[in-house]
Amino acid sequence: MKIPQFAFVALTALLMATTLPSAASETRDPSDFFFQDSFNDLSEEAELAQNEGKIGVLVVFETDDCPWCDRMKETVLNQAQVQDYFRQHFRLIGLNTDGDALVTGFDGQEVSETDFALLHNRVRATPAFLFFDTEGELLVRFTGTTRDPEEFLWLGEYVVKAHFEHERFSSYKRRRRAASS
């Protein structure tokens, strides 16, 4: 029995559609592959970042009951490409703005996660992504979610390539979106 050509093409397309997307957008648990183990000593994290040749430390502030934090973990931070890019350029630390765990700030002062978020960094909403250099200086603050993994990668690139020195992220993002259209 001979299969008609259109049926062969349709079956091939179906097979490709069911196998290619999984390879193109591999997902991994952000707890294991995005965030790194830490004793919450940010001066130590900055030193590690410097020794590893990284830009600095990305501190992600979240809360347990934050739907936007969950959305970022489920749609962006779980992407292998995002995890690999950010781990290449930053030490990645997650802190809970409602947490009681102690954090040693870049200045060596030990405070609770809550105080570090609110008093030291004025984090009022989550998720908040604060990018620090290896000296503990704040480079970029981004609060909220990104549209998709590509936009979050643009945020990383914006910091890595120091575009923040001469333009706002909204302008950079608009330019990148226009270039990719």
Regions found by a protein language model. Give the residues of each.
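N-terminal leader/targeting and pre-domain segments
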Residues: 25-53, 168, 172-181
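Bacterial N-terminal signal peptides
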Residues: 9-18
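Short active-site neighborhood of thiol/selenol oxidoreductases, capturing the structured segment around
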Residues: 53-66
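Typically the conserved alpha-helix immediately C-terminal to a functionally engaged Cys/Sec
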Residues: 70-85
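Thiol-based oxidoreductase modules, predominantly thioredoxin-like and allied folds used
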Residues: 82-111
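Bacterial N-terminal signal peptides that target proteins for export
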Residues: 1-9
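Hydrophobic beta-strand anchors of alpha/beta hydrolase catalytic cores
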Residues: 57-58, 92, 129
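Non-catalytic, surface beta->alpha helical segment in thiol-disulfide oxidoreductase systems
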Residues: 119-165
